[in-house]
Regions:
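Cyclic nucleotide-binding regulatory module and flanking cytosolic helices
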Residues: 1-33, 77, 82-86
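Short phosphate-coordinating micro-motif centered on Lys-Gly-acidic
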Residues: 36-42
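Local beta-strand/beta-hairpin segments that build beta-sheet-rich folds
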Residues: 37, 69-70
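Short alpha-helix-to-loop micro-motif enriched in aromatics/charged/Gly
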Residues: 62-69
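Cyclic-nucleotide recognition modules
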Residues: 71-127
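Polybasic "coupling" helices that flank or enter modular domains
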Residues: 98-100, 116-181
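Phosphate-/nucleic-acid-contacting segments
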Residues: 148, 157-219
């Protein structure tokens, strides 16, 4: 496990007592792939410090349609699992493990108390929040101004980079959930990509054959 101290670049700005309290508030946890860790405003489990694995942060519409907001990887911090600390945040987000994930869980009460007394912790937390909202605003730009074929092409390229593989173990339904659209739309456009020689489709998998072609589509 990555030590708690390595998640905080402001660690040396904390007092010895604050360091001790933060480490004491962190509990080692493990979540297998597919685990729902946080279900919107219903719970406030605490701050998640990811030692290994991958988390997906997403939201769900009233009709049950999902859309991925961003992913978190090793050494990232998940704030929205402790949304009760963020009084200005009024929307519900879900957090699930996409891969087997080891993490530290820091209690909301302990971290909130440290934020109130430590300017370095408060400023660091605000910088993380600003970064996440920047990612969400980028997504909004994609939703408003990008065609779906552009978004799918970009998604496939990003997934290939994330997995370091041109063969993606993804269903059309999973892509639809990430992008907030219908499975039929994904299927139609993937078949178009295949006809263009950019991808090869098989059951539960997509192989990228021409990344340059996908790059052109995504622009």
């Amino acid at each position: 496990m990555i030590p708690v101290s390595e998640f905080f670049p402001i660690w040396n700005s904390l007092t010895a007592v604050q360091k001790q309290r933060l480490e004491a508030a962190a509990v080692r946890k493990y979540a297998p792939a597919g685990t729902l860790l946080h279900n919107g405003g219903e719970d406030c489990m605490g701050l998640i410090l990811i030692s290994s694995g991958q988390l997906r942060i997403y939201t769900t519409s009233d009709d049950g349609r999902e859309i991925t907001l961003y992913r978190l990887l090793e050494r990232d911090i998940c704030l929205f699992s402790a949304s009760c600390m963020l009084h200005s945040v009024q929307f519900d987000l879900q957090v699930s493990a996409e891969r087997d994930t080891e993490f530290w869980l820091v209690s909301s009460e302990a971290y909130s108390a440290l934020m109130k007394e430590s300017a370095p912790i408060a400023n660091f937390t605000n910088s993380i929040m600003a970064s996440r909202f920047t990612e969400v605003m980028w997504l909004m730009d994609q939703l408003l101004w990008k065609r779906m074929d552009q978004r799918i092409a970009k998604f496939l390229l990003d997934e290939a980079a994330l997995d370091s593989s041109d063969t993606l173990k993804l269903t059309h339904e999973a892509i639809a959930n990430h992008l907030g659209t219908a499975r039929e739309v994904i299927t139609r456009l993937l078949k178009y990509f295949q006809s263009e020689g950019a991808v090869k489709l098989s059951r539960g998998a997509i192989e990228i054959l021409d990344a340059e072609r996908l790059e052109l589509i995504s622009e």
